[in-house]
A protein has these predicted regions:
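Residue-level preference for short coil/turn positions at secondary-structure junctions
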Residues: 64-66, 105-106
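Gly/Ser/Thr-rich loops at beta-strand to alpha-helix junctions
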Residues: 114-118
Length: 178
């Protein structure tokens, strides 16, 4: 008979998960950290449809699909640094939907932020305002940039994305940091 305590499966699973998250946080562009965050956002906002960067690229290139309105839900300084071409900016801290007041409520809308959390919440708010075809960009602008997709600013092509801080910046490949 052993006098030591044994870890149960749940404890081991939690420890392994925590170790993987920590490893992910030190990896440039952190695919693991991004995956953990994406899954957490999906769980919290399970009623909101997500669109991957690859799906959005295909959508935008498909002449048979109605064009989506892209909404950037990051602070203005981040939008100014870079965004997806054609996106409109809506302040996530004080959303002013008058920017899209003339957009029919049946228009497909894809909301994005840096990593996905704010965008999913804004997608819920837009649905509450009557937009019935709203989704959010899974992984946000970080996933878009990490996948090599085009970024723009007011002057044309852009090469950097605002990394927020060192912690969130770990989800963004270092070549996109200012």
């Amino acid at each position: 008979m052993s006098t030591g305590k044994r870890f149960n499966r749940r404890t081991v699973a939690v420890l392994v998960f925590a170790a993987l998250v920590l490893i992910g946080l030190i990896w440039d562009g952190s695919p693991l950290g991004s995956l953990v965050l994406r899954e957490a956002v999906k769980a919290k906002f399970s009623t909101v449809r997500s669109v991957t960067p690859a799906e959005l690229v295909a959508w935008r290139g498909d002449p048979n699909r109605p064009p989506a309105l892209l909404v950037d839900a990051r602070p203005e300084a981040e939008f100014t640094m870079s965004h997806i071409d054609g996106a409109v900016w809506i302040d996530p801290a004080a959303p002013d939907l008058s920017v899209i007041a003339n957009v029919p409520k049946s228009t497909p809308v894809v909301v994005y932020d840096a990593a996905g959390t704010t965008a999913a919440a804004m997608a819920v708010a837009l649905r509450g305002a009557g937009y019935n075809r709203v989704s959010y960009l899974e992984g946000g602008l970080f996933a878009w940039a990490n996948g090599g997709q085009i970024l723009v600013d007011a002057g044309g092509p852009a090469e950097t994305v605002y990394p927020i801080n060192w912690k969130w910046g770990r989800l963004l490949k270092s070549r996109y940091h200012p």
